[in-house]
Design a protein with these regions (language model features):
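N-terminal low-complexity, Pro/Thr-rich disordered segments
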Residues: 26-69, 197
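Export/targeting segments at the very N-terminus of extracytoplasmic proteins
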Residues: 56-102, 106, 194
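Surface-exposed patches in mature extracellular/periplasmic domains of secreted proteins
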Residues: 87-98, 109-114, 158-168
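Catalytic and binding regions of secreted/periplasmic enzymes and modules that target cell-wall glycans
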Residues: 139, 144-197
Length: 197
């Protein structure tokens, strides 16, 4: 074998190795790598807060009641809020609607309860087909029932400036007109929680 070719090959390979080492840098670091442990600010786009003064403009009246809600009841809260928005009404209308439904059905979409039922009242608002609220299918549809209630509420002059129980009673014509007031705080809390969700 030609020694000149062998020498050129060895020198070429050595040259490549040196050049590669310079270009690639050292393969072994003598310093331990560090991790930046400084706190990082996380910015979350929060939903706009609901104006609490708008929810209960007159303050709550009387002792307040509260119940724990299951998933179905929470779904009905969200349906009432969605229908309120669809009707072009504000958070206060949602508070009145939810408090009314809390009193009438505990936010349960009730069917006919037989002997325990108040006449033919059904749905979230215990509306009656015989009183012109709609068919059984309509009044047991949360969106329809809420829109029907809100249609009645819109017809009450100055409802926004009334105590909740008076506004609800004017629409519902209940035998227990003062019972709506006990649900105002929970209704306001639910609207504050779900209005922007």
């Amino acid at each position: 074998m030609n020694t000149t070719i062998l020498r050129k090959s060895v020198l070429g390979i050595a040259g490549l190795a040196v050049a590669g080492g310079i270009a690639a840098g050292p393969l072994h670091l003598t310093d331990t790598p560090t991790v930046d442990t400084r706190p990082v600010a996380v910015v979350q786009a929060d939903k706009p807060a609901v104006d609490k003064a708008k929810l209960i403009p007159h303050g709550v009246q009387g002792e307040q009641s509260r119940i724990d809600l299951n998933d179905e009841q929470t779904g009905n809260v969200k349906a009432i809020i969605a229908a309120t928005k669809k009707a072009g009404m504000d958070e206060r209308a949602a508070v009145v609607s939810i408090a009314t439904s809390l009193q009438e059905s505990k936010l349960e979409n009730l069917g006919h309860l037989g002997d325990r039922n108040d006449h033919d009242s059904q749905g979230l608002f215990q509306q009656r087909p015989s009183s012109g609220w709609g068919t059984v299918e309509q009044i047991t549809d949360p969106e329809y029932a809420t829109l029907a209630f809100l249609k009645g509420l819109k017809q009450v002059d100055g409802w926004q400036d009334m105590p909740l129980t008076r506004a609800a009673q004017t629409v519902q014509v209940s035998a227990y007109p003062d019972h709506y007031a006990q649900w105002e705080q929970q209704a306001a809390d639910l609207v504050a929680e779900h209005w922007n969700s």
